[in-house]
Amino acid sequence: SALDEQSFARHASAMAEKNSLLAERRKEVAEGWGPKYIERVHQKGKLTARERIEALRDKETPVREVGTFVNHGVKFGKLKSPAAGVVTAFCQVAGRWTMVIANDNTVASGSWWPKTPEKIERAQEMALRLRLPVVYLVDCSGLFLPEQSRSFAGATGAGHIFKKNALLADAGVPQIAAVFGDCIAGGGYMPIISDRVAMTESAYMVIA
């Protein structure tokens, strides 16, 4: 059948608008809590989570972020947790596809929110199925306490992250952690269970 050029143009225009909107939403999420908090991270001599991933990945290779819109549009009181406060992405490191899990230190100092555990667990599950090394970029102030009752409960609560750590280890999937500054409570368990841990001079771990 002949191509309906008018229909094609109409749908192409509508799709272009949606792609533009999607790009805007991705940019909003990438800014975390905004320029003020990005600047606060930089004033501490740190990089943001996405800047760390950019520095880690092989040059001129893509970063395939997953779970970008977890918690999108959801409010916790007057606060938001863009991407659930954690960046999960596939990227190539030393020529090998890798799953990177990085706390977003522009959102409540990298704390965990509702859906943060599920997002981390999903990334771990993908790494396990694909046998991809996991790199944890940890800069985590622990659980966002006002929402703790919604973060631990259920079959996919925070404790299951550590079960995934064990399953990855049992399957022989490498797990490497880099700790930058805060590493408190649940955020501290992932480095402890990893095969290798690197810490900056100002980094510390507190297990609770």
Predicted region positions:
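Terminal-region recognition feature
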Residues: 1-182, 186-189, 193-206
